[in-house]
Amino acid sequence: MSDCIFCKIVAGEIPCDKVYEDKEILGFKDINPKGPVHVLFIPKKHYATLNDIPSSDLSVVGKIFWVIQKVAKEQGVAESGYRTLINTNRNSGQIVFHVHWHLIGGKPLGPMA
C-alpha cells in the first residue's frame, strides 16, 4: 500500500532499527518506546488490522508469536517478563493501519489500564 509507512519500511524506503527479518515478517524497534525494550512486528504483506487477515494467511500470525518469544529472549526480557499487544482500529488506539504486534519489556509494566 503506497501511503502506508510500514509498507515503506518493508520496501526499504524508510530506515528502521531492525531486530528480525525473514521473508514474511519484519521486527524493528519502536521510534517512541514505552519501555527499554519496545519492538514492533509486522507481516510484510499489508493487512490494515487484525480483522483483515484471512484464514488462508493465519500461519503468519502463529509465526509472529514464535518470533516474539525468540526476540524476547535475545533482548533479555523473556525471564523478567514482557507484554505483547495488538491495537485493532481507532478505539483501541491503532494509529498505523498495518497490523502490528508490540513487544514491550525491560521494566515493570504494571496492570493494563
Regions found by a protein language model. Name each.
Residues M1-A113:
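HIT superfamily nucleotide-processing domains
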